[in-house]
């Protein structure tokens, strides 16, 4: 989780001043917005709402989303547009409240935007002057007098403006419109609303007229200054332009843009009604003219003010002139054309400004410590700004912090109840501490202040991460080099104390921890053992805590005894609070009247907490002098005041909007950003329904920003901004605010689930990219139509659905924002999705999205690991597993743990590492399929190696649970329907229910001192039945663990000896029990818990079994007799006896499907009875097994009742129930005995344990191959129990440890085929998807490339030494150590003919597949015709490492320091090259694309290029001295330009054979094997690391692919077995690696991810396995044997064909001819047809 060596990051000159200030805690040096990259781009749109509606709508629909996407992808920032007119009703545009809010937000945008901040849209309309919301009393009265003087009617002003004495100075304010018009805003009365709007319009026009005339008069007379008159005479747009552009620097103006639209000759169209919105008009019909006064002001603004700004700066201004249609004026078409151009220009300008003003900053993505410090610094500055009380406590802390000369120094503790101001005091201390110390210790000093508000971040909530971050910050400040931080908490604490000692007089240290009670209890953090009681001389620690939480204050008092070290924050007295309130009000120019003060004093007498005073101030500042207040006007507690604050917000913004907005902020894990809040509210239909109650919804459906602004303004100081990972989030400033919000808005479970779902959908990006979400209406029928998952919709319903669905403009939510797809490792992390999505998915029940949207998402895994959050990945997977209980998640977590070292060092290798480990198990764990497909899709961006078939053995360890010190104490183990829950019984009478994964005891029953003989659960797990030595059955309610009844079991009365219960069994409603040596079976009703009746049998009962339907009981007895009873009536139906009557019935099996009963006696004999007529069963089959001397240990019927497994001490038999025959039989080795055996769930595998061994063995049924022998580390296994509900196996060891094995995972091992011996050689035909392997045995194995399974085995008489294939792979020629050669037809497996006589040293086949060259070391080598076996010629020279030239003319080889070219037609040496000066030829190669050019290396360390045609050296390249000392291999590129030389070291030597230059590329380890791709573009090599570097899983070998063009490693993959052979296919770039256990791994290289290669991966069989819903079993492996008879015997220089040989004997002369014999035969034809197929199926090699 922590970047390595964080302590080594020393502040250096290039580090920013911001960073240094943050690390040292100099908060005053930090800007108000701490993180430049953390601010969003906030653009304020200044425009007249009337004439720019279409432009602003088009920009919102088409341009803003694109700009937002651009900013997120390229800078990791939000792009936000503040357009306060959008979505607001027309009658609100003139509202003074709105204008006031606009100016505040404009100022905020100018200050905080990281990029462009202001866009002005100016047309031909100047706009209305504003109605003032509040006017000072003296000014208002002066205006009133002037109006009277001008003979204006002032009644309206007097009616609508009211004097307010609470204002300082007194003022007149505009009364609320709703109050004055007394309108009921009800949608059922639209006429009333329309009338009100009209009335208001008339009134507002009249008020403006009065103000305008009066102010002008006052201004002319000099009674009012221009600056005062401006607010009455200017329109809103001029104010905004003036504020934004008027007094700014040229640098700042680069971030602003103006778009001016002029309409030519607009005055001509003044009478067209629609043109009224594009210009200011005056007069009435028919004398309507353009308002000359407004036009004059517009010209002044547009043609004078703006050009003046442009002249002195680089302000971007675009002016467009549009011409009206002669009839229609400024028509829709003309406007659309203008809007289209504006949109393009707006987008380009924003991009330009963003790129010019914002720097991409990727550093903060990985610097976790810096981000943590900034979060706390940001909070500190925010909290300190709310600090109001200048109390004595601050002085005490000030004095404590200053360095003293002597005496013990202890931490200082500040404590007090909730809302007493502890956090604000500590924030103020943290803010001032640096300055205090600097002042006290001199200007040369450099103090360090570390502040943490515990519990506000993940890292400050846990002791381990808290100490780690503080230690890292100390190490950076005091320049301490910490190589690695301790893992153990006590070592970390020691490091913390050691780092405290680094402080000095010049560098004093202050550490501030607020809210100790917020620390989690992990590592006993709340016991405070980690807190140093005695501090170094220059260290001060200030702590705060609640007095009664977790006993922390009490523990502190035990640690620190001096009372002087404790400061209690107690409530202030009423007078002081009243004084504070008075000052707060005066700051905002308000006061309370003497009448109101009584109620304020009354409230303060009941509560004087700082927060209550602040809440009271919030309420009182809105009081008006003429409004009545009483005792109920003010709350008397903090909680009530907060509730009152929220309710007042609901009135202002709407109940649903406030409840949902505050609910979302409260429920979000880390808070929400402003943009996220906007997005989420837009997705909430209940909010949008409230907002759109009276208006028709339209695209895009969004919440008008005005509501967000009002919400933030109403909660300013309580809803604060906090910087987390470059994002500014809205969070509660106080835990009490959060509690009240939770209580008010997050109580209803349905609402909670719906809100979590909306947040989850938002972070999943469900509604991004313009996807429309249905806007649910109240009509249930319409809602039914809108159900997207509904039946196939009718056309009209579809049309309605489209009409009623709207784009909410939710942004896309990838895990990372990538600015360049070609550089996948340069990105910004979507931290918001990382921190929020999992949290909400687990709370809204979206399991599939949790699994596939996060945990099985490769992009999430890769990103988390890349940014160093590996441990967070594991904790998130664990959380998802606890929630979903999917075992795939558990396996994935274990898999990730095992590859941790590799993927944290090389994150790019994640996909290949995962694919290797998941491919073998995906058929058993199908949910991992999604992750594998994700790896295929996204993995090749980072690693070009894609495993197609993995041979990796599955590593698996079971869950273990210690039950007792010995197995002798454990009497019974029962699995349950919950895979992680088991029941165990001990002989002491205790029955425990365990959760195996957590090792927790869930519940326990004690059976009153009696020893337990056994226990069973009913099939529905409702009842638990326990047999005891008291001869009683105890019946328990299994769910509640309570005893329901106790029933005594009585048997046949004979003799006086004591007998115990011999056994019992359960049906659905009954328990059946019998005593030792008893002929009676007692039947008990489980529901009522009493005995019903006894079954009386002929002989002593040995076993009882019930039918599946619970109707019949089958009682097995001595003398192999079974009696059948009716369970319902107790009636005896019949008795049957087997003729093998030597023993007793040990087991009974009931096959319901076949209506059969199977009796198994103690000696293993079987009798099968047909029970179709239950009263008269008929014997159908029997087996007498008395000859075998081993007893039956266990027996099992397979789940599908198709097989019976009989485990005896010395053998395991599997019977087919269809034929009643032994299908398979496995015998134990000498001196071994079976304890138990079971079948896997699907019956494919047999699992068994042996006596005195600690291993569980797994056999494959079809092959008998032992797939695995898994060791149980806790001791020898004495018992196996199989779960009937899950594919789980329980084993008990001698040490009393219970292990739970997942058979699904273990049977996955059968997905890997092995030959059993190290692979020595691999052959691939030029075309076709087959691989052949040689492993030093007498077999050649044929592998299917797509599946990775062995298809066939070709057996030979001796050990196979050589093998060659035709290009299609249809014919194979092999030779063995018995001097035999074999020609095989690979499809049919037929050995076509066999040649004996000479031991072969090398086999070669010509490129046209016609001839074979058999090279011998002792006798003459031969060239023979493949079709007939006839000799073409003899080669008398011994050749080594030979090749056939591509023209099929020569065989070229080495002999005694010579390179010889021998003719394939005559066998004579045609060309040769001899070394001079006694040098020898070390190695040679043919150049693939140049058939007659040979490259060889000599011992003189020269590389020679020899032309076979001209017999001359074309080129000679000298290598460095001693270069060939360790030569292992060399490869030549197809064009002969490059040579790759391996020397067994860590270097790849690339030799340019044209220029002679040698380039050395460092490899990832010591190179073991290398291969050049057929096209010469890639080098594939396997390297190994020294044993010291071996990782946990023993992966010391790595497979690497290097691109030769740039020397870059494009893929790496660990090999977890020892490789023995490396081969590449000729077509594509497929890699096949042979391993020492006889398995092979198949990989492909995907360098550029194109469609064809994606299809190639998707169609490989390893992917098809898990694509098919019904997974068919693997094809059977065929075994083909060699011919016993020899067809041809080679002598010295002749061949002798056998009489019965399929090869036709011909003249010796014919053997030299190039044409084949005319005497055809069947064998000849088969070979020929196979060879001809080559011509028909030929396709160019890729």
Swiss-Prot record:
<dbReference type="Pfam" id="PF25469">
    <property type="entry name" value="HTH_NWD1"/>
</dbReference>
<feature type="repeat" description="WD 5">
    <location>
        <begin position="1272"/>
        <end position="1311"/>
    </location>
</feature>
<keyword id="KW-0433">Leucine-rich repeat</keyword>
<feature type="repeat" description="WD 8">
    <location>
        <begin position="1396"/>
        <end position="1434"/>
    </location>
</feature>
<feature type="repeat" description="LRR 3">
    <location>
        <begin position="724"/>
        <end position="747"/>
    </location>
</feature>
<feature type="repeat" description="WD 10">
    <location>
        <begin position="1522"/>
        <end position="1564"/>
    </location>
</feature>
<dbReference type="InterPro" id="IPR036322">
    <property type="entry name" value="WD40_repeat_dom_sf"/>
</dbReference>
<feature type="repeat" description="WD 6">
    <location>
        <begin position="1314"/>
        <end position="1353"/>
    </location>
</feature>
<dbReference type="InterPro" id="IPR056534">
    <property type="entry name" value="Beta-prop_NWD2_C"/>
</dbReference>
<dbReference type="InterPro" id="IPR001680">
    <property type="entry name" value="WD40_rpt"/>
</dbReference>
<feature type="repeat" description="LRR 4">
    <location>
        <begin position="883"/>
        <end position="906"/>
    </location>
</feature>
<feature type="repeat" description="WD 7">
    <location>
        <begin position="1355"/>
        <end position="1394"/>
    </location>
</feature>
<feature type="repeat" description="LRR 2">
    <location>
        <begin position="677"/>
        <end position="698"/>
    </location>
</feature>
<feature type="repeat" description="LRR 5">
    <location>
        <begin position="925"/>
        <end position="953"/>
    </location>
</feature>
<dbReference type="InterPro" id="IPR052752">
    <property type="entry name" value="NACHT-WD_repeat"/>
</dbReference>
<dbReference type="InterPro" id="IPR027417">
    <property type="entry name" value="P-loop_NTPase"/>
</dbReference>
<feature type="repeat" description="LRR 1">
    <location>
        <begin position="386"/>
        <end position="410"/>
    </location>
</feature>
<dbReference type="GO" id="GO:0045202">
    <property type="term" value="C:synapse"/>
</dbReference>
<keyword id="KW-0853">WD repeat</keyword>
<dbReference type="Pfam" id="PF23586">
    <property type="entry name" value="Beta-prop_NWD2_C"/>
</dbReference>
<feature type="repeat" description="WD 4">
    <location>
        <begin position="1229"/>
        <end position="1271"/>
    </location>
</feature>
<dbReference type="InterPro" id="IPR015943">
    <property type="entry name" value="WD40/YVTN_repeat-like_dom_sf"/>
</dbReference>
<feature type="repeat" description="WD 9">
    <location>
        <begin position="1476"/>
        <end position="1516"/>
    </location>
</feature>
<feature type="repeat" description="WD 3">
    <location>
        <begin position="1140"/>
        <end position="1179"/>
    </location>
</feature>
<feature type="repeat" description="WD 11">
    <location>
        <begin position="1614"/>
        <end position="1653"/>
    </location>
</feature>
<feature type="repeat" description="WD 2">
    <location>
        <begin position="1007"/>
        <end position="1046"/>
    </location>
</feature>
<feature type="domain" description="NACHT">
    <location>
        <begin position="410"/>
        <end position="737"/>
    </location>
</feature>
<keyword id="KW-0677">Repeat</keyword>
<feature type="repeat" description="WD 1">
    <location>
        <begin position="963"/>
        <end position="1004"/>
    </location>
</feature>
<protein>
    <recommendedName>
        <fullName>NACHT and WD repeat domain-containing protein 2</fullName>
    </recommendedName>
</protein>
